[in-house]
Amino acid sequence: MKPQLLLSLLLAALLPMTASAQSGEGEFPDLFNTSAAYDMLAVFPQADKLAEDPFFTGTLGADTLFLDRAHRIDSVVRPSQLCNLYSLSGGSKDDPEQVVEFFASFDPESLPQKVRGAWIDEICSVRDELSYCLQRLAQAGYAQYWQEQVRPCLNNAIEQYRIAPEQLGAIHQEITRLAGGQPLDATGSRIYILGNIDNAFALLDETFCCTPLLLDPETARQYRIDFMQVYIHENLHRLSLSGELLDMLQTLYDNDDFYRTHEDRARAYGEGGNEAFVVAAERYVSRRLGPVSYTHLRAHET
């Protein structure tokens, strides 16, 4: 099957979708946010660098057990998994102490059946390590460190990036059209800019986390990707795909070498499933909207 036909089949199935939340559009008042809680959960890939920071001299820097357990956590789970689990707790996004309490006491059996799976089992397999490391981070003053050294950098990146509300509205209108007229909830378009990640990922509460690198115009030009592309992509993840579409994706996987090759590549990075469809839909929406770039959006500054 030719790639063009594959894309056509995927996009032909766009209409059997429903928006996860449907309370209307709005003005996107709280688009960018920061979160000490999510940054704390995303710290494990950066544990060595953190321990070398002068702020943690004599605490994390001298705790080999912390580093050993942080490395173990990083080898088993990703920041997106930890942040997704915490997003289900209803806990504060700004209080690291609540993160410590949640991971010390959460019961996997209390989670909704629809979110259980191998990813929860992976988190549970390093539960003791998580509890120890999160407690040590809190005791070492991670909340103060984040307020003094991380948050100012994130706020600076946010303040320098400008988005025209009409541009966001146009994106939501296109996604609403694909969803059969059922709009996304604009209040769900909340993005947490985190200092400890270099990518972006959606959360189960319909928000998503994003690296500040994507707010930087130089990075956007160098890698030909910017925040608005990620915004379209992650908002498409908020849609529920129909069983008909999922069956079609499986049929493509079973019968099409092109699709199977790229799906296997996505699965190797912990993605897969509906990811190929979301990428196809992202390109479709982007083409309908025309070029979306940092320079274009800056023209809308007031």
Where do the language-model regions lie?
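Bacterial N-terminal signal peptides
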Residues: 8-16
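N-terminal mature-domain "stem" immediately C-terminal to a signal peptide or N-terminal signal-anchor/transmembrane
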Residues: 22-102
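Long, mid-chain structured domain cores
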Residues: 78-172
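Auxiliary, metal-adjacent structural segments of Zn-dependent hydrolase domains
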Residues: 153-205
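Active-site scaffold of zinc-dependent metalloenzymes
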Residues: 197-225
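Active-site recognition of the HExxH zinc-binding catalytic motif
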Residues: 225-245
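Post-HEXXH active-site segment of zinc metalloproteases
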Residues: 242-266
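Conserved small/polar residues in nucleotide/adenosyl-binding loops
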Residues: 295-302
